[in-house]
Amino acid sequence: MDKKVARIRRASRARHLMREQGATRLVVHRTPRHIYAQVIAPNGSEVLAAASTVEKVIKEQVKYTGNKEAAAVVGKIVAERALEKGIKAVAFDRSGFKYHGRVQSLADAAREAGLQF
C-alpha cells in the first residue's frame, strides 16, 4: 500500500466517526505549496466557510504559502468566517495528515481565534 492510499484510508475512518456523531467538520488539506481549510455542514453537502493560501487576501499577507506562518493565517481567517456564520464548535478533520507542522499551526490558530474543537 502506498503512502497516499494509506492516508486516504485513515481519513475515511475518521470521517466515518465524525459523521456518526453529526459534527460540523473543519477539514484540512495540504499540498507542498498550499493549505486549504473548509468548515463543512454535518450532512456533508454544504461548505459553510473556507479559506486557503490561494486566495489573494492571504497571499498578500505572507511571503511564502507553503509554511507554518501561512497555515496560521488560514486557520485564523477560516475561524473568523465560521464564527460570523454562528459556528462555534467543530470536529477537526486532518484528512489523514499527521497532526504536526502546518496542520498543527492551522489548528492552533483556529483555536486562538475562537473555534472550539
From Swiss-Prot:
This is one of the proteins that bind and probably mediate the attachment of the 5S RNA into the large ribosomal subunit, where it forms part of the central protuberance. It comes from the Bacteria. Part of the 50S ribosomal subunit; part of the 5S rRNA/L5/L18/L25 subcomplex. Contacts the 5S and 23S rRNAs. It comes from Glaesserella parasuis serovar 5 (strain SH0165) (Haemophilus parasuis). Belongs to the universal ribosomal protein uL18 family. The keyword Flavoprotein does not apply. GO terms for biological process: translation. One of its GO terms (cellular component) is cytosolic large ribosomal subunit. PANTHER family: 39S RIBOSOMAL PROTEIN L18, MITOCHONDRIAL (PTHR12899), LARGE RIBOSOMAL SUBUNIT PROTEIN UL18M (PTHR12899:SF3). This is Large ribosomal subunit protein uL18. GO terms for molecular function: 5S rRNA binding; structural constituent of ribosome. CDD domains: Ribosomal_L18_L5e. Gene3D superfamilies: 3.30.420.100. Keywords: Ribonucleoprotein, Ribosomal protein, RNA-binding, rRNA-binding.
